[in-house]
Regions:
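Solvent-exposed loop/turn segments at secondary-structure junctions
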Residues: 24, 44-48, 79-82, 110-114, ...
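A cross-family glycoside hydrolase active-site/sugar-binding cleft signature
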Residues: 42, 74-78, 105-108, 132-133, ...
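Short acidic, glycine-rich surface-loop motifs adjacent to enzyme active sites
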Residues: 58-85, 107, 210
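Short beta-alpha junctions and helix-cap segments that line functional grooves
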Residues: 26-28, 90-94, 115-119, 149-151
Length: 221
């Protein structure tokens, strides 16, 4: 719907986790469905994604599902407020997708730390498979597992959400080169490998890449 912005990697990472072929790791880090064909639908340019943006994307999928053979839609975005699916246009489009044979999967949201832990559209739609997050602390020890601040129901319509819990952190995924995220990752790798007496010089040589590191270094002087 829009020209891709190379600085935006939020939706691309789930795509790779779902269907990546692991080419950068010789197949070691592959997605759950590496043989899948992926249709990338760009909802907006850099900045905020609105309910209307998501609705437009789903309507495009409905119109083009047969042309591209689309059977599953994954959405890594959510709306702005809790709304009943009976009156919410975005939720209604989710139901239309389901009626057309398209499975809609959506992140349930990151508001589990809020008092009302709201589940918003499209995840709150009855036919949407909402996915919550698990933090396994990068360990196979079940005792170390915990939730990752995911939103949860009941929804405003009394529906229990999410339907599925999946790992949401400690997942290997590629980072788009030459982006702020990639620069921060490279800097953190340097710091991790450096001896203590080299930490401040490295931070001083890379001012502006990670504001939190800059602020921490300033406080120590």
């Amino acid at each position: 719907l829009c020209q891709p912005d190379v600085a935006s990697w939020h939706g691309m990472i789930p795509s790779v986790v779902a269907a990546g072929n692991g080419s950068l790791s010789n197949g070691f880090y592959r997605g759950m469905a590496p043989d899948s064909d992926v249709v990338l639908v760009k909802l907006a340019r850099t900045g905020r994604i609105t309910d209307q943006n998501i609705q437009d994307g789903l309507e495009w999928v409905l119109e083009n599902r047969q042309k591209y053979g689309i059977k599953v839609v994954n959405i890594s975005a959510g709306g702005d407020e809790e709304l009943s699916y009976l009156h919410d246009p975005l939720s209604q489009v989710v139901e239309e997708c389901s009626a057309a044979g398209i499975t809609v999967v959506c992140a349930v949201g990151n508001a589990g730390h809020l008092p009302n832990h709201p589940v918003v559209p499209p995840a709150s739609a009855p036919s949407c498979i909402a996915v919550g997050g698990l933090d396994d602390n990068n360990s196979i020890n079940r005792a170390k597992r915990g939730m990752y601040r995911s939103s949860y129901g009941p929804t405003i319509d009394g529906l229990q959400k999410p339907e599925i819990i999946a790992s949401s952190i400690w997942i290997p995924a590629p980072i788009l080169p030459n982006t702020p995220t990639a620069q921060q990752a490279e800097l953190l790798e340097k710091l991790d490998k450096a001896p203590d007496d080299k930490l401040h010089p490295i931070i001083d040589a890379n001012v502006g890449i990670d504001p939190e590191l800059d602020a921490a270094a300033d406080r120590e002087f």
